[in-house]
Amino acid sequence: YGIPAYNFLKHIQSNYPGRVAGTEKETEMAVFILSVLLNGGYAESDIAIESFEIDDSTPMMDEAIQNVFDGGEKSNSSQNILITKKGESEKTIIVGAHYDSAGTHGVDDNGSGVSVALENALRMVNTPTYYTIQYVFFGSEEPGMYGSRAYVESLSEKERENIILMINIDTVLAGDYLYLYGGKVNDNGTVDNTEAVFKAYEIVKEIGLNIQLPPDGNNDYPYPTGQKRSDHAPFNDIGIPYIYFEANNWENGSPVETEKNGLIMHTDMDDLDFIENEYSGRVQNTLSSYSTLLYSLLQENNWEQ
């Protein structure tokens, strides 16, 4: 587990730097994802492309982000790539990862999530599952989760009812600790919808993976939730349970990602060569751990509460 993901990541590092929302590079990355899936055994009828508009005038992105690479001509449209693997049940698990990046190599954020999802999609193509699995590669997360918001807004009532779980994989390469988050924070600060993440954590312990829940006692992010700024948020907003995979470092109460270098995401350190030189063995370990867990979660047939 994790070796195919690593090979995808090396390809992304070399070929798709600066895949900023709406740019040619973002579109090229979408084409790459489609080619992997079509060559990996999925039929064209399993795949859908969902286009949507993006508004470039409201970037949520941090001004400090270094645009190291030019992603080419920019437009105000982007797309999600949807792949459906039918299970015995119509009840569906969404596996999501955004494929756009800041103006960097974007291997941590979020070539890593894309690579783990692609590896899993190829592994599952001929694997019988109880639940239907839909892989969604979201465009344009960085400027404000445009892809996941468009996806959730497009769902029919029936489709919403059928989605029992969303697994979001975002920035799983460089952080010091491997985390799982979940749960919906209520207005009074209590947290609901935690059954899925706690079940996932039990599976982590059964397998013996070095993945943990975030530290308890953080007033800004009630346990076991994490930051809202990723593609699980629109699903959470409509009450769909989620499990969010992210490598980070919360040991001192705020997410610094790495003790040694601070944030890797959104900086020019988001580069596979740099990460491998700085953190020997971390890349393979992280990809392997999350790939193993994802496969195990999708083998379960009792996610409905």
Regions found by a protein language model. Name each.
Residues 77, 101-195:
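Acidic/histidine-rich catalytic neighborhood of metal-dependent amide-processing enzymes
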Residues 10-84:
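A non-catalytic alpha/beta surface segment that caps or lines the substrate-entry region
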Residues 1, 13-27, 34, 67-72, ...:
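Second-shell loop/turn segments in exported
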